[in-house]
Amino acid sequence: MEYNRISFVEALQNLAQRAGVELPEREQTAEERQQADARVTLRDMNKEAAVYFHYLLKSKRGTQALSYLKNRGLSDETINHFGLGYADIYRDDLYQYLRSKGFTDYQMKESSLVNIDTVKGNYDKFFNRVIFPIMDMNQRVIGFGGRVMGDGEPKYLNSRETILFDKGRNLYGLNYAKRSRSNAIILCEGYMDVISLHQAGFTNTVAPLGTAFTPNQAMLLKRYTNEVILSFDSDGAGIKAALRALPILRQNGLRAVSYTHLRAHET
């Protein structure tokens, strides 16, 4: 349950659906109903945000962002497959859009998509960034990553943790990699690495979510494979990341080998 950030009831329903078993109806407690409603609201909001970001990317307002992705070698098919998007330059653009869809300030604050500030004014977490929706195993958007297109800092910005999203218990691209026919999973460093490798045919590629690789992520990989290939950069940071990840993988019963490489251009 913790891996997927779902309630006990949702976990039972998922298992029953896979097994083709019909569960008897049970009256939910008030707390369970409240938690379930909050999850549904957040999923709906994330979906609306992802659709809006993707729309902006394909609009005139997203011309620069789309050119950036095309210059990185991504095809239209790949951009659509991963649902990539663009957060506009206006600081409250998404806030105004979500308000028009009926979401409250409190709900937006809980989503991590908007910062609610009665003094400075409400403003979006992501603006003027390329957007990478992060999905769970059921293809539902649970969070976002955003990358600047220039030299701004931080280069990458991720959603904070919510009732749906735990960075240390999810892996970017695993929703696709779990379907791969390969016996091994490739672990690389970031969003663009995953997307580029998938486009090249390595659909068994995943990446951590802006944090160091964790034992929980190793346990998650163990559910889908027994072998992991680390494909990190050959710079100091990449080597250190590989050296940290290797023992974690092996301690969790995974065969792990490291392959460092020189990157044609930075990510």
Model-predicted segments: where are they?
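Phosphate-handling DNA/RNA-contact segment within nucleic-acid enzymes
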Residues: 34-49, 67, 89-224, 228, ...
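Arginine/glycine-rich "motif VI" loop of SF2 helicases in the C-terminal RecA-like domain
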Residues: 220, 248-254
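Conserved small/polar residues in nucleotide/adenosyl-binding loops
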Residues: 260-267
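Short glycine-centered, acidic/aromatic-flanked micro-motifs in structured strand/loop junctions
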Residues: 232-234
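Residue-level marker of alpha-helix boundaries and capping positions
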Residues: 2, 55-57, 85, 164, ...
